[in-house]
């Protein structure tokens, strides 16, 4: 299973395709935080905010478009959670 994922990612890289790496196995292979667990949203928002504060800007680069959308969604969810608590 992991070997198949590695083969698919390698082939995609050679063919200049984009993979947003949303799955568990893909993120384990490349050493990123896996998109799972109850604390993932809060951790992701914290790390994303910290990174952008250091850069002092949220990038509008098209390659970071998905990250910008995720940031907005997570920010809205955290605001809703604060209102409920």
From Swiss-Prot:
MF term (GO), any: DNA-directed RNA polymerase activity
Reactions accelerated catalytically: RNA(n) + a ribonucleoside 5'-triphosphate = RNA(n+1) + diphosphate
One GO location term (cellular component): mitochondrion
Enzyme Commission number(s): 2.7.7.6
Entry's localization field: Plastid, Chloroplast
Keywords on record: Chloroplast, DNA-directed RNA polymerase, Nucleotidyltransferase, Plastid, Transcription, Transferase
Keyword Nucleotide-binding: no
Sequence similarity: Belongs to the RNA polymerase beta' chain family. RpoC2 subfamily.
Name of the protein: DNA-directed RNA polymerase subunit beta''
Organism: Galdieria sulphuraria
């Amino acid at each position: 299973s992991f070997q198949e994922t590695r083969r698919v990612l390698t082939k995609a890289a050679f063919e200049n395709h984009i993979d947003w790496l949303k799955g568990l196995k893909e993120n384990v292979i490349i050493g990123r935080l896996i998109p799972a667990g109850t604390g993932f949203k809060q951790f992701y928002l914290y790390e994303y905010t910290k990174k952008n504060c250091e850069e002092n800007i949220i990038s509008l680069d098209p390659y970071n478009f998905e990250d910008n959308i995720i940031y907005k969604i997570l920010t809205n969810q955290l605001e809703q959670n604060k209102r409920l608590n």
